[in-house]
Amino acid sequence: MHQASFSDLAYANKKKTTRKEKFLGEMEEILPWKRLLKPLLKKYPKPGNGRCPIAAEVMLRIYFLQQWYGLSDPGMEDSLYDIESMRRFAGVDIDHIPDETTILNFRHFLEAHQLTEKLFRITEQYLSERDLILSEGTIVDATIISAPSSTKNQEKRRDPEMKQTKKGNTWHFGMKAHIGSDTRGRVHSVVVTDASVHDSQVMADCLHGEEQAVYGDKAYANEEEKHKAKSQGIDWRVNRKAKRGKKLNCADRSFNKKSNRVRARVEHVFGIIKHLWGYRKVRYRGLAKNAAQVFTLFALANLYMVRRELASAPG
């Protein structure tokens, strides 16, 4: 049996609950742990003649901590030694903290079996069952995730799977996360491409097919897609684009203003991922590894956005 250390006793007797403790307590309560673990346990190494693997739930909890706090594998190991609230969330004591290689290997395990996309699908279904993701309308949008553009690295070159794109007057190098969300900003579809792929090229992949309305900025303005949507009875609420040499008329400006009231709701999820959790730059080389992280981030962001509804729900 684990004997309580001095730090354990001091932690138990402290008076103030920190923001970190409050956040981790909320996420502990609302994450559907059994559902999330089910696909992992089918693939996770079983105890055998060799060293017994650390429990999948412990490793998944540590992986989530990395997403929320933007921690590298060595940084995660150090934080588990330093921060009691993280150890408690992970379910480990100070004598059984996994090292950075174990943390790295778990991430590779998730990537190898495409499990983070499954985690995203599980959370999306979980919220849909509770009417916390709606199917009536979809907002499409994309955000750029920067990658290092310098060649001052071990390979002496930039990541060949990342590309550049121009936004306004500024060039960006990296990848894009394209999403489809419901009209409250909860994400149901995620597609990751290099940054050079135009938003409209993956629009269809960001729809679930049961929409009654589609919202998007002028990057998605496409007459062919518009006619296709209208022929299916879908309300096309994509922002209208001024023709070359002409300004939008009053009716078009009014249309865009009304659509923007709904479309703006998708910015909340980007704000959570980029500003609250600090995911502005890719952490790994290659699209596949970074896409795996993106699926996880949007799954967790969906749950975070509806944490109060989940916490107050019966059962």
Identify the residue ranges that each predicted region occupies:
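Charged, often Cys/His-bearing segments associated with DNA-binding zinc-finger transcription factors
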Residues: 1-34, 38, 42, 312-315
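Short helix-capping/linker segments at secondary-structure and domain boundaries
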Residues: 68-75, 278-282, 302-315
